[in-house]
Curated annotation (Swiss-Prot):
GO terms, molecular function: electron transfer activity; heme binding; iron ion binding
Keyword Signal assigned: yes
Quaternary structure (record): Homodimer.
Keywords: Electron transport, Heme, Iron, Metal-binding, Signal, Transport
GO cellular component, one term: periplasmic space
UniProt cross-references to Pfam families, sorted A to Z: Cytochrom_C_2
Binding site for heme c: 31, 87-88, 137, 140-141
InterPro entries from the UniProt entry: Cyt_c/b562, Cyt_c_II, Cyt_c_prime, Cyt_c_prime_subgr
Signal sequence, renumbered to the chain: 1-21
Protein name: Cytochrome c'
Any one GO BP annotation for this protein: electron transport chain
Post-translational modification: Binds 1 heme c group covalently per subunit.
Keyword Secreted: no
Amino acid sequence: MKRMMIVAALAALTTTTVAQAADPAAYVEYRKSVLSATSNYMKAIGITLKEDLAVPNQTADHAKAIASIMETLPAAFPEGTAGIAKTEAKAAIWKDFEAFKVASKKSQDAALELASAAETGDKAAIGAKLQALGGTCKACHKEFKAD
């Protein structure tokens, strides 16, 4: 239930609040926030695996939340928000927006695969899918995030 509320809130933000933001800097703050959430979800999954925590369904729920964020992430990078405020977003995002959308989709797909693995409870499979998701993040960062 809690996960569904989080996903619904994220979806509402991407389709309403972000779309209505008059200040381009609001997009920067929004995307920093959701990307930070993604990082924190991944860290939580890693801790759960490493420490063998008994938190039923959380890994799958976190992975599904990441997938939801990745599905809507490109909307947080509209024209006119490049170079606004302090950001690590490279101009390559707007120069080749289709490639950015493909990278986001790869992360979404990897997160859904992680969620599926998590539902089996197979820790080796979960670990492998978490690494695969991390690989999609790394590839996107290499192309679209400044150091």
